[in-house]
């Protein structure tokens, strides 16, 4: 079942802290977080994760999985997901070390999606994206069958 939640607040109001807590990166000072056994969460932070600079884009994605199910029985390859997020054939052959900040963020998101999460936590997901990438991301997330928290 698809569910969407938008977190809004002033800078410093705790949006990122809440997301990191939900992703299991922070501990509660009090209380507890109970996660169901079928929950598979993925967190896209504002900060770029280090990726091996010697990898090619497609290689970095295929290290997670070769295929991913998008829901409704639809399955696509790592290469097809790369294309949906703006990495054409030439882009998939580029070295990670040669990517811009926005391209690395796009690659990070692609890798998260390849892991088949049913809960996506996206902290300021549009940072560093151009209009074309934003449109592709919006189209992809519109069809996302899981829980989406932005």
PLM segments and residue spans:
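ABC ATP-binding cassette signature C-motif
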Residues: 1-150
């Amino acid at each position: 079942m698809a569910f969407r939640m938008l977190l809004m607040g002033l800078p410093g109001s705790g949006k990122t802290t809440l997301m990191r807590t939900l992703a299991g990166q922070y501990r509660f000072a009090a209380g507890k977080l109970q996660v169901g056994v079928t929950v598979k969460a993925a967190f896209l932070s504002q900060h770029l994760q280090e990726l091996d600079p010697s990898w090619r884009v497609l290689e970095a994605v295929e290290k997670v999985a070769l295929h991913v199910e998008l829901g409704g029985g639809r399955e696509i390859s790592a290469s097809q997901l790369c294309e949906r997020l703006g990495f054409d054939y030439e882009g998939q052959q580029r070295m990670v070390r040669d990517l811009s900040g926005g391209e690395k963020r796009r690659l990070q998101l692609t890798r998260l999606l390849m892991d088949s999460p049913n809960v996506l936590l996206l902290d300021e997901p549009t940072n560093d994206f151009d209009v074309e990438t934003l449109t592709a991301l919006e189209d992809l997330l519109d069809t996302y069958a899981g829980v989406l928290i932005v």
